[in-house]
From Swiss-Prot:
Domain of life: Bacteria
Cystine pairs: none
Keyword NAD: no
Name by which UniProt lists this protein: N-acetyldiaminopimelate deacetylase
Family per record: Belongs to the peptidase M20A family. N-acetyldiaminopimelate deacetylase subfamily.
Gene3D superfamilies named in the record: 3.30.70.360, Zn peptidases
Signal peptide: none
Role: Catalyzes the conversion of N-acetyl-diaminopimelate to diaminopimelate and acetate.
Keywords per UniProt: Amino-acid biosynthesis, Diaminopimelate biosynthesis, Hydrolase, Lysine biosynthesis
GO molecular function: N-acetyldiaminopimelate deacetylase activity
Amino acid sequence: MVLRETDLIPIYQHLHQIPEIGLQEHETQAYLLSIIGKMPQEWLTIKTIPTLDTAILVKVSGLKHDYRIGYRTDIDALPVTENTGLPFASTHPGVMHACGHDIHMSVALGILSYFAENRPATDMVFMFQPAEENASGGQRLYESGALDGDWMPDEIFAFHDNPNLPTGAIGCRMGTLFAGTCEIHAHLSGKSGHAAYPHQANDMVVAGAALVSQLQTIVARNVDPIQSGVVTLGHFTAGTIGNVIAGEAQIDGTIRALTQEMNMHIQRRVRTITEGIALAYDCNIDLKLNQGGYYPVENNDAITADFIKYMQEDDDVNFIETEPAMTGEDFGYLIHQIPGTMFWLGVDSPYSLHSENMVPHTAAIMSGVNAMTSFLTHRNALHK
């Protein structure tokens, strides 16, 4: 049976009630498998991954097997205490689907159910991926080897819900949709001492302040003004009391850039400046830059041009050309390995993603299912 709105909204509501942190999505996985297990199995092969044990892969065997189209959804939630007042609010204290991955999963199930009933022209691989929020789940999935061989897609698609777009609208653009991100963690070590004898100590408040100040020059003086880059240092701790010179400091922040080349350029400047501050202030700085799998989501030109043209010509789709977002998304790793397109699906919420009050409009679910079953059928037909 093809899942329709009357099926998918209760599925969404149940998923919303059982949010789980990345790599812990066992109840979510079991529920997804129960839904997938009720679909016609004639063309389906279901696979789990021992080294990524909450992931699910489903292959739909097409009429031909020399091309594969991939579709990915994320399945994890956030450590947020829900404040929506919904009758189907989270039953897991301190965890919430505040980023809409419950919407993502519901749409994916709807699309999968269609192709389980309507055999596609080519093979399709549906990926229910854990740990988008916290542990580079896309990279883990790819590097697990589970996609190797006849599970590896030739092209791949995914979406993210967008509270700033009208319900059901499809938003996309050529080029980068999401920025690549990189965590900055710097631990400074000097020598503590009495405030009355600064010459006998090595003050990490002063060294840390210099590091913060100098890192802020990167975007202003080392990044082409026509391109985009962000260096934000949101955490700086040092010292215990006002009359003791701090011998330790911790600085944490983030890099954002719309291309991987710019991200790497900024990372190099962070390293160089940090080395200079350590030398200038005669201290040790343990610098860790952690990008993981959070590469920029750079849409493939040819595939995305076809996606945009198709959506613009579909009278049932409200297509909106969007600007790049400086938020991160680990689909960036997958799309660097497999050409494809990511897009936005509007859910029209007054609250932002990651808000404890975020409530998407569920009418978007069928809009996403209908648009993507139609488009993926079109993509299949190109390779039959």
